[in-house]
């Protein structure tokens, strides 16, 4: 059972396709979505696999507790991420699905706005509390669940025209909110994205759902026959992407090592130290600041920035 949890943020730099395979809808290759809300997500399995690949390619030496190890040490990776033959034992490091927090939408003023909604904010707050975190700015608790729909951060927004925001071709009347201002400043500190207080707006749950369905990037792709210079038969398809600037969050989860004999626990065999804490320490030491997630890696898609909860910059 997991004993420790560490939140982290995923800031999409280039459009990201975490796909579900082919479907019969309008888009041939849609992105992953939650079944009950329709909100975009990245499955934990895909996130974990991408993270493991980065660890396996990094030969940097790090200190975990009082022992030193290479990040790509096979024994350590198998103990944390799990062995290739899963029947032997489970890994001590897990991940949750990456959930949407802020979604970028074209704005008449300020180029684009970050939109979210009360449902997303309330769920984010609940999950942070479950993980043992606090949402406070300078010692002041932020009432996220009290932030209403159709609001903007008081005094900081740069996407408003009078008291309205124009997103795509839709106009929304907004009201200033002090709690949203505090939350936006707090989130900017945690993610390192300084423009959040100037661009964030809270819409209704239904309006948010419409935008995350209708304002993703859908790209038409083709394959050219080198001999004829024309499109090959059946080689025209559409592919959906989460747009650049999208912000998601996930949790790294740690448990004690799933080995009975101390000598089989590798660097995590440190009497007097919490094994789950050592697993998180290894993750924090080896996690990448920039990595690739999802499909189309060879055409530059899916580049993201990873920001741990504890990081200051």
Each model region followed by its residue ranges:
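Basic, Gly/Ser/Thr-rich N-terminal segments that form RNA-phosphate-binding interfaces in CRISPR RAMP
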Residues: 1-313
């Amino acid at each position: 059972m997991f004993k420790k949890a560490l939140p982290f943020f995923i800031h999409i730099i280039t459009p990201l396709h975490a796909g579900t395979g082919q479907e019969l809808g309008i888009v041939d290759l849609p992105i992953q979505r939650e079944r009950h809300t329709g909100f975009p997500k990245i499955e934990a399995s895909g996130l974990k696999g991408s993270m493991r690949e980065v660890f396996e390619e990094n030969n940097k030496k790090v200190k975990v507790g009082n022992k030193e190890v290479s990040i790509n040490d096979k024994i350590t990776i198998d103990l944390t991420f799990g062995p290739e033959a899963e029947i032997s034992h489970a890994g001590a490091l897990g991940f949750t699905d990456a959930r949407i927090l802020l979604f970028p939408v074209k704005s008449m003023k300020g180029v684009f706005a970050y939109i979210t909604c009360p449902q997303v904010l309330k769920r984010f707050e609940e999950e942070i509390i479950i993980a043992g975190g606090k949402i406070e700015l300078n010692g002041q608790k932020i009432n996220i669940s009290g932030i209403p729909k159709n609001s903007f951060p008081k005094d900081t927004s740069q996407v408003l025209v009078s008291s309205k925001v124009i997103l795509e071709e839709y106009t929304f009347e907004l009201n200033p909110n002090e709690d949203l201002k505090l939350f936006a400043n707090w989130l900017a500190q945690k993610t390192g994205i300084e423009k959040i207080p100037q661009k964030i707006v809270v819409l209704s749950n239904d309006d948010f759902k419409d935008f995350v369905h209708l304002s993703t990037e859908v790209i038409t792709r083709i394959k050219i026959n080198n001999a004829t210079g024309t499109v090959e038969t059946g080689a025209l398809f559409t592919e959906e992407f989460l747009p650049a600037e999208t912000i998601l969050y996930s949790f790294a989860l740690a448990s004690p090592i799933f080995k009975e004999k101390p000598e089989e626990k590798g660097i995590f065999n440190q009497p007097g130290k919490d094994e789950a804490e050592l697993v998180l320490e290894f993750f924090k030491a080896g996690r990448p600041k920039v990595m690739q997630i999802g499909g189309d890696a060879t055409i530059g898609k899916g580049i993201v920035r990873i920001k741990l909860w504890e990081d200051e910059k």
